[in-house]
Structures are given as C-alpha cells and as structure tokens.
C-alpha cells in the first residue's frame, strides 16, 4: 500500500456536500468511485480534512488514502484528474508517511467568504458569493473582527447540527477587505478548527455589525452568553470557500 496526500479544488454547487450520502452526488463519493475504477474494483476509502456542506466550495481541500500499488505522485495526479468531472480539479498529489491523516494531522484551516454588494443579485456570481444589499460600514467590521482573535468559546456560533461538545476554538486571523473591481467584501478566517456552520454564522453577525444593527463589540457579548439564538443568522453556503489546510 502507498499512502497519498492529495489537494483538490471543487465547485460545491452541484454536490450534496463532501461526505458520502446514499443516492446523493458528493465529493467524497466521486473521488472514491474514481480511485476504485483505477484499482479495477478494489474499494479505496478517502479521508478528508473536513466536511463541506452542500453549495460550499474548496480552493484547497486535502484528502488522504491508501492505494494498492506504488504509482508516482505525478502519475497519480494525472490519473485522478483524467477521471474527475468538470467541477473537481486535483491540484497536487504527494506520497506521505502512513501515519498522515488529512483530518487528524491538520493544525489549522483558512476559510474565505465572499459577499457581493449592491441592491440586486448578480445572476452570474450568485452561486459563488453571498449577497448583502444593505449599507455597510466596513471599518466597523474591521474593528469587530479583532475581538475574534484568540481562544474563545464559540457556542453562540455553532449550528445545532454539530456533534462536537467542546466549542472552544482559537482564531489566529480574522480579516475583511473590499474588492472594488468585483464590488465584494471578502472575509478570511484562520484558526485551529471550526464548528459546524461557524464561519457562516460569524459572517452573518459581522454584516449586522457593519449595518449598525449590532454593537461593534457584540462578538464579546455573544462569547459570554453562549446562546446560538442570540447570533441568529447564517450566511448562505454559496459564498464560503475552504481556502487552505495547514499541517
């Protein structure tokens, strides 16, 4: 057996998320089907760095798997890409030690979230951005995001569908910038781990701060109350991208 680490990008629009689900098109399912075809029927199980929901995209998802035989990394890259649909691209393949695990070896992740501005929804980017038609003070958001940096209990920012009990996470970077060319604001979050829907809830809260509906330091209050109902909103899946996984 040879152990591989593979980095890939995908458009999440037409996937029911990353994880295999019965009778659903998923990223993991497509990958495992392709690898099983390469082995002429011997099943190959793929481990991902994390699960992305339906509609969420990836610029740098990482998977790991054992493969029967010893194919050079560059040949694995080419072989996998030859079997990929148009909405998945294999970016890099590496042969790694057997103890490497895409999820459990990860030290951190970076997510990007794109928000389209303007009153009307652009039909050409609606599947790849969130949309916020109301006024925004980006400087207020910049101030607010500084409160996220550090180690906090993110109970208020975890959707109920998650199964993880410990809600404490560390955020190393939380930034926002304006793109005048695309008329978007772009959030980036880098941390040691993220809870179910956490980034989308953080973005929704930050937008309300930028709009003046919340106090500029409301993140601090939400950390203290540990109540998901206090944060309320969740930004659409379409604007979220798993940008990079760190090991």
UniProtKB/Swiss-Prot annotation:
Classification via InterPro entries: PsdUridine_synth_cat_dom_sf, PsdUridine_synth_TruA, PsdUridine_synth_TruA_a/b_dom, PsdUridine_synth_TruA_C, TruA/RsuA/RluB/E/F_N
DNA-binding recorded as keyword: no
Gene3D superfamilies the UniProt entry points to: Pseudouridine synthase I, catalytic domain, C-terminal subdomain (3.30.70.660), Pseudouridine synthase I, catalytic domain, N-terminal subdomain (3.30.70.580)
GO molecular function annotation: RNA binding; tRNA pseudouridine(38-40) synthase activity
Residue numbers binding substrate: 111
Residues at the catalytic site: 53
Source superkingdom: Bacteria
Entry keywords, A to Z: Isomerase, tRNA processing
GO BP field: tRNA pseudouridine synthesis
EC category name: isomerase
Enzyme Commission number(s): 5.4.99.12
Catalytic activity: uridine(38/39/40) in tRNA = pseudouridine(38/39/40) in tRNA
Subunit structure: Homodimer.
Function of the molecule: Formation of pseudouridine at positions 38, 39 and 40 in the anticodon stem and loop of transfer RNAs.
UniProt record similarity statement: Belongs to the tRNA pseudouridine synthase TruA family.
Name of the protein: tRNA pseudouridine synthase A
Organism: Lacticaseibacillus paracasei (strain ATCC 334 / BCRC 17002 / CCUG 31169 / CIP 107868 / KCTC 3260 / NRRL B-441) (Lactobacillus paracasei)
Upper taxonomic lineage: Bacteria, Bacillati, Bacillota, Bacilli, Lactobacillales
């Amino acid at each position: 057996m040879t152990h591989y680490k593979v980095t890939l990008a995908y458009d999440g629009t037409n996937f029911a998320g990353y994880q295999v689900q019965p009778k659903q098109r998923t990223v993991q399912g497509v990958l495992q089907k392709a690898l099983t075809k390469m082995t002429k029927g011997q099943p190959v199980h793929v481990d991902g760095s994390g699960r992305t929901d339906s509609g969420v995209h990836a610029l740098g998802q990482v998977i790991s798997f054992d493969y029967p035989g010893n194919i050079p990394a560059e040949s694995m890259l080419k072989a996998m890409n030859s079997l990929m649909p148009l909405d998945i691209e294999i970016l890099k393949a590496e042969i790694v030690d057997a103890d490497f695990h895409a999820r459990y070896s990860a030290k951190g992740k970076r997510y990007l979230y794109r928000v389209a501005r303007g009153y009307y929804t652009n039909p050409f980017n609606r599947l790849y951005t969130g949309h916020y038609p109301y006024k925004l003070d980006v400087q207020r958001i910049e101030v607010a995001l500084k409160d996220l940096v550090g180690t906090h209990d993110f109970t208020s920012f975890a959707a109920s569908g998650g199964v993880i009990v410990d809600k404490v996470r560390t955020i190393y970077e939380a930034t926002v910038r304006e793109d005048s060319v695309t008329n978007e604001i772009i959030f980036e979050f880098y941390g040691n781990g993220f809870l179910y829907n956490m980034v989308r809830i953080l973005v929704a809260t930050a937008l309300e701060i930028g709009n003046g509906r919340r106090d500029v330091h409301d993140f601090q209050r939400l950390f203290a109350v540990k109540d998901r109902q206090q944060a309320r909103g969740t930004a659409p899946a379409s604007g979220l991208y798993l940008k990079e996984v760190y090991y």
